[in-house]
Amino acid sequence: IALALAAPGVRIFAPIPGTNYVGIEVPNRNRQMVYLPDVLAAAGPGPLQVAIGEDVEGHAIVHDLAKMPHVLIAGTTGSGKSVEVNSMIMSILMRATPAEVRFIMVDPKRVEFAPYEGIPHLYVPVVTECREASSALSWAVAEMERRLKMFSKCGVRNIITFNEKARAAQAADEAAEKRGEEPPENPYGEPIPYIVIVIDELADLMMNVGKEVEFSISRIAQLARAAGIHLIIATQRP
């Protein structure tokens, strides 16, 4: 089909969802630029709305990372992995404060996340050494377990409910202070931020500190959704 159409390649959809037809997608020779603000205009509420792009009909695709809850982006060199990772990062930075979302960025290539060095959303400086990456992921596992224990103690199921109750308790404290009364006991403390862990080129980490990294990523992928910790991972090789 690609030969007959003189196209660089085609994609087959068999069937097109909701129909009994087979779809053939042929790339347009004249590419249309997709701008991040245009895609984000379709985003709903929430600090973890991330821009994916546009579909073949030009409709914006935006997803909530809190519901996904983790992302694995794979592809060859030049396929657009880094563009998508940076789009996701910028989607969050444009809509969330450091009190709402914090990042841990792992960059074995040392150049991909260099522009983000020093931003207030970072928990730690951009991690470039494999051993440091292993330690950062181990810390994330410990933080996940600490949060889950705290949720259990407070009788909540996830970070959304915890933060709602924490804000309500803060409002009650402020109202009591204005009335000159002693504030009620607040078992929740401050609202806690989401944590987004972004790893560029996972294969490099797996070759150097595979066992430690694999254990931490597995634990986070299995249990961290309720704790508000999410993974965005890019790799060339599985």
Task: Give each language-model segment a name.
Residues 17-62, 67-68, 99-105, 142-238:
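P-loop NTPase motor-domain active sites and their immediate coupling elements
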Residues 13, 74:
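Residues at the beta-strand->loop junction immediately N-terminal to the Walker
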Residues 84, 88:
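Hydrophobic positions on the alpha1 helix immediately C-terminal to the Walker A/P-loop
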Residues 77-78:
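The conserved Walker
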Residues 1:
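Cytosolic ligand/metal-binding cores
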Residues 71:
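Conserved beta-strand position immediately N-terminal to the Walker
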Residues 81:
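Conserved lysine of the Walker
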